[in-house]
């Protein structure tokens, strides 16, 4: 599952703004988005990933995604860097 991918990834960026920045700079290899995030956030990140031809994986929980990133709060989006 994608939570394990995040745990095993060498370099990640956490959060919507940083994820979109990594996509625009061509640094993201994969994007993980939490399905319980606000719809406009999901759409914005997904659109940026599609534009950059980067695969998007959806997970069910912001809280679990944040935990996989070793932070104490939820994460709406995470990019695994190249």
Curated annotation (Swiss-Prot):
Pfam families assigned to the protein according to its UniProt record, in alphabetical order: Ribosomal_L7Ae
Gene3D superfamilies referenced in this protein's UniProt entry, alphabetically: 3.30.1330.30
Superkingdom in the source lineage: Bacteria
Keyword field: RNA-binding
Gene Ontology molecular function terms on file: RNA binding
Family: Belongs to the eukaryotic ribosomal protein eL8 family.
The protein's name in its UniProt record: RNA-binding protein GK0100
Organism: Geobacillus kaustophilus (strain HTA426)
